């Protein structure tokens, strides 16, 4: 079809959307009157109310994600131990297998400054967790559009990420990029 395929697509898109209500994730994708722009986020008004000031007397990291290798949590915990910042970290999430769970448990065993409440499904409890910490850490090796970043920023908490996923910043303020080594 070659260059005709673009023309055919354009005609079909105009034909179909002229008689339909279009739902898009960004206003750049569809600007007509018969469309709606929605947010793919789980944020609602509760996330934007009753802000609590962070307690800055002690560094309190928060990790909210699956506890899987691609999320970089194992490497981050090794760095966390070596850095010996006198900080705390709470890890909210679950593993996808018993093997990974055992590996994770052996890694945090005996570490008094690591809190592992597990998976939290309650929105109120999750908001409370963000409020009790002062930095969200997202050590992932790869990410698309992580909603935990929006959650942390909604609760006015900065986010620490690594160079691998610097593309997620997208003009947002409050996201800080670090190298993955302590030197």
Give a label for each model feature.
Residues 2-51:
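A short, active-site helix/loop in glycosyltransferases that binds the activated sugar's phosphate group
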Residues 59, 66-82, 99-102, 127:
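A conserved mid-protein helix/loop that constitutes part of the nucleotide-sugar donor-binding site
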Residues 64, 88-102, 116-120:
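Glycosyltransferase donor-sugar binding loop
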Residues 119, 128-133:
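Short alpha-helical donor nucleotide-sugar binding micro-motif in glycosyltransferases
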Residues 127, 146-154:
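Short alpha-helical segment that forms part of, or immediately flanks, the ligand-binding pocket
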Residues 141:
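Aromatic "clamp/platform" in nucleotide-sugar-dependent glycosyltransferases that forms part
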Residues 154, 158-161:
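Short hydrophobic beta-strand element within catalytic cores of glycosyltransferases
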Residues 174-182:
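Conserved acidic donor-binding segment of nucleotide-sugar-dependent glycosyltransferases
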């Amino acid at each position: 079809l070659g260059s005709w395929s673009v023309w055919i697509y354009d005609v079909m898109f105009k034909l179909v959307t002229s008689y339909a209500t279009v739902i898009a994730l960004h206003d750049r994708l569809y600007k007509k009157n018969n469309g709606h722009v929605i947010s793919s986020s789980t944020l609602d008004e509760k996330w934007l109310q009753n802000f609590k000031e962070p307690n800055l007397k002690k560094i309190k990291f928060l990790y909210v994600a699956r506890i899987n290798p691609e999320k970089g949590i194992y490497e981050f915990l090794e760095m966390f131990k070596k850095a010996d910042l006198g900080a705390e970290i709470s890890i909210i999430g679950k593993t996808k297998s018993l093997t990974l769970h055992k590996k994770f448990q052996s890694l945090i065993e005996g570490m008094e400054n690591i809190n592992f409440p597990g998976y939290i499904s309650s929105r109120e409890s999750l908001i409370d967790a963000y409020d009790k910490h002062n930095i969200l850490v997202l050590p992932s090796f790869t990410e698309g559009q992580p909603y935990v970043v929006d959650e942390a920023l909604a609760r006015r908490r900065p986010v620490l990420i690594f160079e691998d996923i610097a593309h997620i910043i997208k003009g947002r303020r409050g996201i800080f990029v670090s190298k993955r080594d302590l030197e």
